[in-house]
Structure formats: structure tokens, C-alpha cells
Amino acid sequence: MAKNILLVGGSHGIGLEIAKKMQKKYTIYIASRTNEKLEHMEVNYISFDATTDTFTDANLPEELHGFVYCPGSINLKPLKMLTLDTFKEDMELNFFSIVKIVKVILPKMTEGASMVFFSTVAVAKGMPYHTSVAAAKGAIEGFSKSLAAEYAPKIRVNTIAPSLVNTPLSKRLLNNEKKRDIMDQRHPLKRVGEAKDIANLACFLLNEENSWITGQVISVDGGISTLNIN
């Protein structure tokens, strides 16, 4: 029997790439604001806005074998231009929504289930203009490790920390050739990430054959967090 995976925010970018890679082997449930890119895919769509809606398990199966939370923000501004409301909004979307959903789905998570969250390279590597998003993603890293400890050995919990990835979320940072080249050159591998780079690791962490990795924050960042070659 196919195993069940819940993707929140799986209608574009990294989440969509994960769904494409896993739809043949798993039964995929996607909770997202939009579904136009899902119409010809073998997935179950649940209308859900992580910033405004209350998540329920009404449309979920009895058992879940995997959970991925994909929504995020790239709110890059100097601290003096950020309001407290901006920090609250980033925390709500990136962190508090995860907590709310996890509390709903935990009773459905089976023995050996896997959860995957997303952080950012800017948590481990201090970067200017990242105060709000780094704070929110840092909360995810702490939550992920504590959750992994609390629910071991039943549930594995890991977080992926990417650098800049070419997705709709980062469009304004990569919307012309000059910007793209600057961002490419910042990375030791001389390119920004693609959705498939991150999705490949997420799928690996979800796979039931990968049963000895938990409580980790794994960087997928073209080497930018550890290599200084510029």
C-alpha cells in the first residue's frame, strides 16, 4: 500500500518539485493556496493558506508517513526599515504555522515517519539584511532538533538549510542577467540552487530506507556556508 506524504506549500518551487518526484511511489496530499500547477498530477489537493487558515485533519488519511513544510519568505531589508509587525509576520508564516500543523498531525504520524522543514544558510552564516528571516528560520532549527529528540525513535525530524534557490519566491533577486551573475559568483560552485537540488535531499530524508538520520540541519548551499574561495 502506498505511503502518505503531506506537503504544505507544495504547489510551486521546491514543494512542487518534491511532489513531482514522489507522486509515483507515494500518495501525496498538498495543502496550498493554489492548485493550477497540480491539475495534471497524481496528488490530493487541500485548499489552505498558511497565513490565514486554521489547519484541520479533515481531508487527511488515517496515517501519515511523511510531512514537509515548504512556505517561506525572503524579507531582506536593513533592520531600521523593519517593523515589529514584519518580524511577527515572518515568524507566523515560517515558524508558528509549522507548530500549529505539527500539533494537528502528530497523532497520524506512523512509526518510522519523517518530517522535513526548511531553514536558510543565513542562520549559521550571518548575513546583512537577514535579521527577520534568519530569526524565524532559526526558530525552526531549534524546534526541529527538540522535536526530533522528543519523538525519537518513532519520528525522524530534519531541516534543510539552502542558500539562494531559483524559485518563484526568489524571483525579484534573480530577475535579470546581472543579478543572476552576481548571485552565481557568490557561491563556490558558481551557480545558485535549483528547486531539484533541494528536493532531492528532501526526498532522501523522507524515504523509509533512510532511517538513521534525525535531528540534523543539513546545508545545501553551493558551498557558501563553509568555503571561502573568493
Where would I find each of the regions flagged by the language model?
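Alpha-helical segment proximal to the catalytic Tyr-Lys
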Residues: P107, A148-P153
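Short, small/polar-rich loop/turn modules that mediate ligand/substrate recognition or access, typified
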Residues: A152-R156, I213-G215
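Short C-terminal tail/terminal secondary-structure segment
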Residues: C203, T214-N230
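Substrate-binding pocket helix/loop in short-chain dehydrogenase/reductase
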Residues: P78-L79, T83-M91, M183
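Active-site helix of classical SDR
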Residues: V102, A136, S144
